[in-house]
């Protein structure tokens, strides 16, 4: 009987739930990924660079994809999933962090990022579970909401 080796490429990414208070409510920076239908909202995230720490990746990707700078508050957790890319199965781990807005104007991003991001918008954190397209990201937003309810920021 032949023996087959099942191998899977692994990817490690990091992203952020970047929050701020506007008019008395917590809002988060959401992106509409390039090429997706209107109404598909996601969190900024991307591959961890060689020698880069996941928290630094979350801050960098948030700035690249939204135009804002933030500070790291806490790690929210990891999501894991498998997807297929060009016929190859990929096991992906995405570490998410709670980030606090510090400066910048949402949506002011470099022209080359327009391929990846069609739009960035502040959306109510309370509504994140209804607005975000991906289940794991909804869970991270729920953790962010629980954190801001239980802690003084």
Language-model-detected regions and their locations in the chain:
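C-terminal alpha-helix
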Residues: 143-151
């Amino acid at each position: 009987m032949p023996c087959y080796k099942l191998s899977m490429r692994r990817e490690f990414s990091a992203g952020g739930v970047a929050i701020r208070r506007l008019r008395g409510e917590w809002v988060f920076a959401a992106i509409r990924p390039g090429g997706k239908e209107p109404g598909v909202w996601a969190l900024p995230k991307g591959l961890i660079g060689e020698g880069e720490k996941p928290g630094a990746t979350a801050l960098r990707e948030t700035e690249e994809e939204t135009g804002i700078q933030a500070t790291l508050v806490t790690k929210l957790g990891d999501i894991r999933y498998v997807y297929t890319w060009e016929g190859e199965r990929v096991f992906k781990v995405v570490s998410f962090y709670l980030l606090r807005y510090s400066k910048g104007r949402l949506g002011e991003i470099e022209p080359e990022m327009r391929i990846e991001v069609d739009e960035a918008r502040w959306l109510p954190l309370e509504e994140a579970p209804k607005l975000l397209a991906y289940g794991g990201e909804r869970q991270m937003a729920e953790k962010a909401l629980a954190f801001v309810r239980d802690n003084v920021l």
